[in-house]
Amino acid sequence: MADLAKIEEQLSSLTLMQAAELVKMLEEKWGVSAAAPVAVAAAAAPAAEAAAEKTDFEVVLASSGDKKVEVIKVVKEITGLGLIEAKKLVDEAPKPIKSNVKKAEAEEIKSKLEAAGAKVELK
């Protein structure tokens, strides 16, 4: 233990330049890098997620457009809401219509709403 205490004391007395030089020497001698591997893996994870295609979507009614009554009918059909609830949802646009749906279903909902005159976003 006495030897470790001496090493700790010597390392504590190093200047910043000397410590950096020591790190370089140890990296070369042991063939390692002082960079934290966790930081590298964490930085690579978001890139991998971005590369994977999104599977679940949220259909958002951006605006009802000019044919509000038609849009309310379609929203009622898609969501299973009553007429009053569907009207309220359309009036409060932008508002999510349906969440966690597969791409094909989201595209189908989007096309129905757009055919009724609404502006729709997939998120």
UniProtKB/Swiss-Prot annotation:
It holds the Pfam family Ribosomal_L12_N. One of its GO terms (biological process) is translation. The keyword Ribonucleoprotein applies. GO terms for cellular component: cytoplasm; ribonucleoprotein complex; ribosome. GO terms for molecular function: mRNA binding; structural constituent of ribosome. Keywords: Ribonucleoprotein, Ribosomal protein. The keyword Transport does not apply. CDD domains: Ribosomal_L7_L12. InterPro entries: Ribosomal_bL12, Ribosomal_bL12_C, Ribosomal_bL12_C/ClpS-like, Ribosomal_bL12_oligo, Ribosomal_bL12_oligo_N_sf. It comes from the Bacteria. Belongs to the bacterial ribosomal protein bL12 family. Forms part of the ribosomal stalk which helps the ribosome interact with GTP-bound translation factors. Is thus essential for accurate translation. Homodimer. Part of the ribosomal stalk of the 50S ribosomal subunit. Forms a multimeric L10(L12)X complex, where L10 forms an elongated spine to which 2 to 4 L12 dimers bind in a sequential fashion. Binds GTP-bound translation factors. This is Large ribosomal subunit protein bL12. It comes from Rickettsia bellii (strain OSU 85-389). The gene is rplL.
